[in-house]
A protein has these predicted regions:
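The feature marks short-to-medium sequence segments in extracytoplasmic or secretory-pathway proteins
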Residues: 65-66, 77-124
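Short, solvent-exposed loop/turn segments enriched in Ser/Thr/Gly
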Residues: 66-72
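Short edge beta-strand/loop segments characteristic of extracellular beta-sandwich folds
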Residues: 73-77, 129
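C-terminal motif of bacterial Sec signal peptides marking the signal peptidase cleavage site
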Residues: 28-29
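N-terminal secretory signal peptides and thylakoid transit peptides that target proteins
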Residues: 1-21, 25
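Low-complexity, acidic Ser/Thr/Pro/Gly-rich terminal tails and inter-domain linkers that flank the onset
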Residues: 37-65
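Short, conserved catalytic or interaction motifs in soluble domains
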Residues: 32
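Surface-exposed edge beta-strand/loop patches
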Residues: 122-169
């Protein structure tokens, strides 16, 4: 072998390398999106220039544990140029044997997001109510906030154990 590398050989090996790199990403998979996870009330996540702080978690239930309702108080600051519309579709609450996502179990109590949009630089407090959720019995609880539903691979998450909730109350 002379050690020379022809133009044809160069192009052939370059194409082969490109195919190998593309194939390896198909086999290994790619992690798309950004999903930070916090583990306690009072913590913040920043996703898509939207800062969200889980300020407080309250649970109300009858003495026997029935008629449980959990309320999450979220403070949202919009750092984006476009306005945010925050509705119940932006949230999901999951726990053992419990899922509230775009159904009647989940409700944004305040403010009325259909008549109010959060503009750039504005901060609003949202109360998200999960009906039928008792975090002491169904825990751990995961609250997910999707700032922009068009980019559902980006979300802010809070995984809350019973111990984290007890220390917050």
């Amino acid at each position: 072998m002379t050690g020379e590398f022809s133009r044809r050989s160069f192009l052939k090996y370059t194409a082969l390398t490109a195919v190998a790199v593309a194939g390896s990403s198909l086999l290994s998979g790619c992690e798309y999106g950004y999903n930070p996870v916090q583990n306690a009330p009072g913590t913040s996540n920043v996703v898509l220039k939207v800062r969200t702080t889980l300020d407080m978690v309250e649970c109300h239930a009858d003495d026997d544990g029935s008629n449980a309702t959990t309320i999450f108080k979220l403070v949202v600051t919009n750092g984006r140029k476009n306005a945010l519309e925050v509705t119940k579709e932006n949230f999901a609450v999951k726990a053992e044997g419990y899922l509230a996502y775009q159904n009647d179990k989940l409700q944004v109590i305040y403010p009325d997001s259909l008549s109010y949009q959060l503009k750039q630089g504005e901060t609003a407090t949202y109360y998200v109510q999960a009906k039928g959720l008792n975090p002491w019995e169904n825990g751990p609880v995961t609250l997910t906030y999707y700032p922009d539903l068009q980019y559902s691979e980006f979300s802010a998450n809070w995984e809350l154990t019973a111990d984290a909730l007890k220390s917050a109350t």
